[in-house]
Amino acid sequence: MIEFKQVTKTFHSGNQTVTALDNVNLHVARGEIYGVIGFSGAGKSTLIRSANLLERPTSGEVLINGVNLATLKSRELQKAKRNIGMIFQHFNLLQSKTVFDNVATPLKLTRTPKADIRKRVTELLSFVGLSDKADNYPEQLSGGQKQRIGIARALATNPEVLLCDEATSALDPDTTSSILHLLKKINIEYNITILMITHEMSVIREICDKVAVMEKGRIIEEGSVLSIFSNPQHPTTEKFVRSIIPTGLPARVKEALQQKEPNRRIYEVTVTGDSSHSDLLRSLIQTFGIEVDILHATMNDIQGTSFGRIYFDLRAEPEILAEASNYLKSHPLQPKEVTGDARVAA
């Protein structure tokens, strides 16, 4: 649906060349809500603005429905852009226009008949819950209401793609939650593909199906939201995950490590969905006659799927511990031995 192929974007400032996007490859499937997260200056805004050619790539291709927008002539490009809606961090509403006229603007630009405009705008204002604000002006609205109007305007031309540029970063937590709920509703009821950028991992957790992490113009990690949260690989990704889910060693585990008992090993296992840690622990007891103690367990929820980390220790003679370690190395749950602040493969 949306595809970036080896996209690079450079800017020139005096004698300096700044690379905002560096050989980016990204694929967003039809119907997905795909989040891109990164710190300030990571290249997120340039990426999303490249999706509808607000920024033209220096090299590479951006494809929407298999079409490279950069190859289209002016009239064809205008038509293609009607299929791409966009909402902004600071709403970008016309202050001198009423709510009705703001939502109607894209339709007026395409010379849609007045009766059709009224029908569509009325429908959209009802959808975003602001039917009673049609004659109001933006200055009379709250931040959340302004963003709802921005969303209605972005949907006016019945797009298949919605681009969200930090759509909730100017909003308070409760309003953010309501806007995210509305975006999820749009995705489900209108089957609109959503590409959103944010610096808030809580937004990714709330509604995204997949996520890409950007740093210095590159995608450094990507995958399903569940896989990224449960097993971040890059240090930057781990920072984002840690901002809402602690990943450090629990106090009891640290205390156990400090005791440095020779016949004791400590492991961490990540469990997701239906994965059964109880079978793992039971097999250790039954197969090796080994003493197993759960030191700490945490559970979290990602869009209805639970995942967590369990820390357990094994006590036995060195030969038995060695056999158990070999067993754990081949186990599907891939437990990791905890040594100090490090986790190493079992």
Curated annotation (Swiss-Prot):
Any Pfam family matching the protein: NIL
Chief location: membrane
GO molecular function annotation: ABC-type D-methionine transporter activity; ATP binding; ATP hydrolysis activity
Residues binding ATP: G38, F39, S40, G41, A42, G43, K44, S45
Keywords: Amino-acid transport, ATP-binding, Cell membrane, Membrane, Nucleotide-binding, Translocase, Transport
Cited InterPro entries: AAA+_ATPase, ABC_transporter-like_ATP-bd, ABC_transporter-like_CS, ACT-like_dom_sf, MetN_ABC, MetN_ABC_transporter-like, NIL_domain, P-loop_NTPase
Topological type in the membrane: Peripheral membrane protein
Lineage: superkingdom: Bacteria
Enzyme class: translocase
Disulfide linkage: none
Reactions this protein catalyses: L-methionine(out) + ATP + H2O = L-methionine(in) + ADP + phosphate + H(+); D-methionine(out) + ATP + H2O = D-methionine(in) + ADP + phosphate + H(+)
Assembly with partners or alone: The complex is composed of two ATP-binding proteins (MetN), two transmembrane proteins (MetI) and a solute-binding protein (MetQ).
Annotated function: Part of the ABC transporter complex MetNIQ involved in methionine import. Responsible for energy coupling to the transport system.
Record family assignment: Belongs to the ABC transporter superfamily. Methionine importer (TC 3.A.1.24) family.
Descriptive protein name: Methionine import ATP-binding protein MetN 1
Lineage, opening ranks: Bacteria, Bacillati, Bacillota, Bacilli, Bacillales
